[in-house]
From Swiss-Prot:
Site positions (Important for activity and substrate specificity): P327
Name the record gives this protein: D-galactonate dehydratase family member RspA
Name of the encoding gene: rspA
Named cofactor requirement(s): Mg(2+)
Keyword Heme found: no
Residues where Mg(2+) binds: D223, E249, E275
Length: 415
């Protein structure tokens, strides 16, 4: 009886679970869970270009099954939604579960009166190294952008560049300031042209120009966005070894995991993969066969804190480090949670950081700080992020889609 009484006293009953879709420049899906004590938790469920599917999954299926549950029982709730649906994994399901998990960790940390990273086991480092994005229509423009970010103090810098003879430049911002937004508003995605031959010929010239001008002081990163075949990626990785890249990201579509063996046979350029992954099962082979160096899974798409902890712990056995996806199509709620996770996780590598527009940060008041290339979550209890519902309501959902790519002959390709 005494044990039952103790359990009941520690029970933190969920009384409300609400879903908000707001577009302060771009669409975000936010879950807010409230307990009977009035403690609230926030979770991010944003899935770029498929936001309403996740919002419906939460609103129609998960939220009703949260009411009356004990918010402390995070693991049980995670398993209930993962196993209980019967249909497992996939981006919509896992983004919804991720938001629930994030919100429950926010609540638990607030109830404990601790910032989340303390609850996870405390800080493993003083700050979180983040990498920024730089690009330009030409090499000169890209070098100018690099210099600007170097002056801001970034220690890790991603470089992209327009390729002569191609109309569109991957990585060019449509948003204001640091808020990069590749999605185009409207009912139809933008179609972009891609030429692997032009890319392979030109891109090493960019890295050469960067290293010649700025030296090797910063970590240099590059995203290939799934566009090369395995043998092309092997050739490319080998050709850029002298530039000592921190990583080449998504060199080829990762569904065919065996093909990374071919890339590994030919190059020691480090490889980062996983932003489109949704569970540890997507990562398992690449990690245990040492086919990658950084795992790019993110809290919003891979099962929240609970899912990401499993992935990171497994990766640590093989000295694979985290390099979480973090563009501005994940909301500030995810960024806040990621910084707590990054402060704690022993096998941390780097965190992607793109910044947000003022509009976005007004809707999501935050507590993190950036100082000379490193970020910190702050020490407020929970995630240290808030959500202004009234302001969010002024920015209703607007259809927007990521681009698609076609080869010069019209064949649909990987964007």
């Amino acid at each position: 009886m005494h044990h039952d009484k103790r359990c009941k006293e520690s029970n933190m009953k969920i009384v409300k679970a609400e879903v908000f879709v707001t577009c302060p420049g771009r669409n975000f899906v936010t879950l807010k869970i409230t307990t009977e004590d009035g403690i609230t938790g926030l979770g991010d469920a944003t899935l770029n270009g498929r936001e309403l599917s996740v919002a419906s999954y939460l609103q129609d299926h998960l939220c009703p099954q949260l009411i009356g549950r004990d918010a402390h029982r995070i693991e049980d709730i995670w398993q209930f939604f993962y196993k209980g649906a019967y249909w497992r994994r996939g981006p919509v399901t896992m983004s919804a579960i991720s938001a629930v998990d994030m919100a429950l960790w926010d609540i638990k940390a607030k109830a404990a009166n601790m910032p989340l990273y303390q609850l996870l086991g405390g800080a493993s480092r003083e700050g979180v190294m983040v990498y920024c994005h730089t690009t330009g229509h030409s090499i000169d423009e890209a070098l100018d952008d690099y210099a600007r970010h170097q002056e801001l103090g970034f220690k890790a810098i991603r470089v992209q560049c327009g390729i002569p003879g191609m109309k569109t430049t991957y990585g060019m911002s449509k948003g204001k300031g640091l808020a990069y937004e590749p999605a185009t508003k409207g009912q139809w995605p933008e179609e972009q042209l891609w030429s692997t031959e032009k890319y392979l010929d030109f891109m090493p010239k960019l890295f050469d120009a960067v290293r010649n001008k700025f030296g090797f002081n910063e970590h240099l990163l590059h995203d290939m966005h799934h566009r090369l075949t395995p043998i092309e990626a092997a050739r490319f990785g080998k050709s850029i070894e002298d530039y000592r890249m921190f990583w080449m990201e998504d060199p080829t579509p990762a569904e065919n995991q065996e093909c990374f063996r071919l890339i590994r046979q030919h190059t020691v350029t480090p490889i980062a993969v996983g932003e489109v992954f949704n569970s540890i099962w997507d990562c398992k082979q690449l990690i245990e066969e040492q086919l990658i160096d950084y795992i790019r899974t993110t809290l919003t798409h891979a099962g929240g804190i609970t899912g990401m902890r499993r992935i990171a712990d497994f990766a640590s056995l093989y000295q694979v480090r985290t390099g979480s996806h973090g563009p501005s199509d994940l909301s500030p709620v995810c960024m806040a949670a990621a910084l707590h996770f990054d402060l704690w996780v022993p096998n941390f590598g780097v965190q992607e950081y793109m910044g947000y527009s003022e509009q976005m940060l007004e809707v999501f008041p935050h507590n993190w700080t950036f100082d000379n290339g490193y970020m910190h979550s702050g020490d407020k209890p929970g995630l240290g992020i808030e959500f202004d519902e009234k302001l969010a309501a002024k920015y209703p959902y607007e259809p927007a889609y990521l681009p698609v790519a076609r080869l010069e002959d019209g064949t649909l390709w990987n964007w």
